[in-house]
Amino acid sequence: MGIEHELNILSAHRKPQAVAEYSQQAKSKGIEVIIAMAGGAAALPGTVAAWTEIPVIGVPLPTSEVKGIDALYAIVQMPPGIPVGCVGIGEWGARNAAYLAASIVGPQDEGVRDLYESYRKNLREN
């Protein structure tokens, strides 16, 4: 949709300090929503959410023998007080995470709102 974003590759298991630093600094960098994608134990979305108050959307990835079901359960079963929004598994989930992020940011950002509304209008008409 042409919305400004950044991409970071972080691991909650291999680089937990980097995840904590990124998550804690996100708000001061102007980041309004974090999309965290993870497979297997899928600790990344919950770890990010533990370190920031901005919305976190988790995307379970089909990286294991059970094709992402483990990641889905790990993301949706967060303890009270540390919420993570969760979308579907894999590519469709990743796409819906971006659309959900746009719908979260849109009410405060006219440019994002216009892009997202245009996208939705195009879906209805085509």
Residue ranges and their predicted role:
Residues 1-14:
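Glycine-rich phosphate/diphosphate-binding loop of Rossmann-like nucleotide-binding domains
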Residues 6, 67-126:
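C-terminal binding/interaction regions
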Residues 6-8, 34-36, 57, 85-88:
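Short glycine-rich or small-residue beta-strand-to-loop segments that form or flank ligand, phosphate
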Residues 7-10, 20, 25:
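Thiamine diphosphate
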Residues 10-12, 39-40, 61-64, 89-92:
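Short, ordered loop/turn segments at secondary-structure junctions
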Residues 15-18, 38-47, 66-69, 94-97:
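Short glycine/serine/threonine-rich phosphate/pyrophosphate-binding segments
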Residues 22-64:
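Glycine-rich phosphate-binding loop
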